């Protein structure tokens, strides 16, 4: 138990430090691939491992964007950049996110940033053993509405366990009838999203983040090797195809990834965008539930 808590606290300390550093380098003209490489490299330098590929979701893009191989995307003036990063220490995960405005953004963007940040603060203040999950969603929704914004209703926070980023319990961002009670020792990622749009996300066709699902009979020897490396390196945690390029030839890797997706050996995460094309802000912390409150490990 002591080792587990120490690992969570170390992972939280790492992502907090890297989040602050990365927020400071986000600027007009910065290639996204430079940002994600910086974040992931710094996590390793600080003694952790990336728990998932660094997400850099800009404007209406809401989640699951990381640089694919050869990404030429660049951050621009007026962009609203959501930076979502995670680290693990021996499989124990800390997950955090921040929204950074680049240059001149309008007042609505600042309002939605304030809404998401305050919703996170208010949600954390309600968390303790015995609190119903639905109560957290109510607090988040009411806070975001008080700023004249809408929560993103079909994205949620989540519980985490060792090597498992989403371990089964969803933490809603809206008021819903969920009477599940939090328990002491639960590890939760609380992540409100605020927007002036309709508050729904939809899939985009792109998939740049993946996760191991199961062993499958595979015709291609190379695909079997790729799947073995995925299982060995990342367990059940999300990974990016660009992470595998140091091990495999790019052309054969592309063919293997297609086969692994088709055989359902790995799960592809679609990039998500706000349905009405509106800007979105996000804030996130990881907490450990206690009898009379919680410890925020990513402050």
Curated annotation (Swiss-Prot):
Domain of life according to the entry: Archaea
Residues annotated to bind a divalent metal cation 2: 95, 158, 191, 284
Cellular component, GO, one term: cytoplasm
Pfam families, alphabetized: Peptidase_M24
Residues binding substrate: 64, 166
Keyword Plastid: no
Catalytic activity: Release of N-terminal amino acids, preferentially methionine, from peptides and arylamides
GO molecular function, one term: metal ion binding
Top class in the EC scheme: hydrolase
Co-factor note (free text): Binds 2 divalent metal cations per subunit. Has a high-affinity and a low affinity metal-binding site. The true nature of the physiological cofactor is under debate. The enzyme is active with cobalt, zinc, manganese or divalent iron ions. Most likely, methionine aminopeptidases function as mononuclear Fe(2+)-metalloproteases under physiological conditions, and the catalytically relevant metal-binding site has been assigned to the histidine-containing high-affinity site.
Record-level GO BP terms: proteolysis
Keyword Protease: yes
EC number: 3.4.11.18
Cofactor(s) the protein needs: Co(2+); Zn(2+); Mn(2+); Fe(2+)
Entry keywords, A to Z: Aminopeptidase, Hydrolase, Metal-binding, Protease
Binding site for a divalent metal cation 1: 84, 95, 284
Subunit architecture: Monomer.
Sequence similarity: Belongs to the peptidase M24A family. Methionine aminopeptidase archaeal type 2 subfamily.
NCBIfam families the UniProt entry points to: met_pdase_II
General function of this protein: Removes the N-terminal methionine from nascent proteins. The N-terminal methionine is often cleaved when the second residue in the primary sequence is small and uncharged (Met-Ala-, Cys, Gly, Pro, Ser, Thr, or Val).
Protein name according to UniProt: Methionine aminopeptidase
Organism this protein belongs to: Methanothermobacter thermautotrophicus (strain ATCC 29096 / DSM 1053 / JCM 10044 / NBRC 100330 / Delta H) (Methanobacterium thermoautotrophicum)
Gene that this sequence comes from: map
């Amino acid at each position: 138990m002591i080792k587990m808590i120490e690992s969570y606290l170390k992972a939280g300390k790492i992502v907090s430090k890297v989040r602050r550093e990365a927020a400071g380098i986000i600027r007009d003209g910065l290639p996204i691939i430079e940002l994600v490489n910086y974040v992931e490299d710094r996590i390793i330098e600080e003694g952790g491992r990336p728990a998932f590929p660094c997400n850099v979701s800009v404007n209406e893009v809401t989640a699951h964007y990381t640089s694919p191989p050869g990404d030429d995307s660049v951050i621009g003036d007026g962009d609203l950049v959501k930076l979502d990063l995670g680290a693990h220490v021996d499989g124990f995960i800390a997950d955090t996110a921040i929204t950074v405005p680049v240059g001149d953004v309008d007042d609505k963007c600042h309002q939605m940033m304030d809404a998401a940040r305050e919703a996170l603060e208010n949600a954390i203040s309600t968390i303790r053993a015995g609190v119903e999950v639905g109560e957290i969603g109510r607090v988040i929704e009411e806070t975001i509405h008080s700023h004249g914004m809408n929560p993103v209703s079909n994205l949620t926070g989540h519980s985490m366990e060792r090597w498992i980023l989403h371990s089964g319990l969803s933490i809603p961002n809206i008021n819903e009838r969920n009477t599940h009670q939090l328990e002491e020792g639960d590890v939760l990622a609380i992540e409100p999203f605020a927007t002036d749009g309709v508050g729904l996300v939809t899939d985009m066709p792109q998939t740049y983040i993946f996760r191991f699902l199961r062993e499958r009979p595979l015709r291609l020897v190379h695909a079997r090797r790729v799947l073995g490396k995925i299982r060995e390196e990342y367990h059940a945690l999300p990974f990016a195809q660009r992470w595998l390029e140091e091990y495999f030839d790019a052309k054969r890797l592309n063919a293997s990834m297609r086969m692994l997706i088709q055989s359902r050996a790995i799960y592809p995460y679609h990039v998500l965008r706000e349905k009405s094309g509106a800007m979105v802000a996000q804030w996130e912390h990881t907490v450990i539930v206690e009898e009379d409150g919680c410890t925020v490990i990513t402050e």
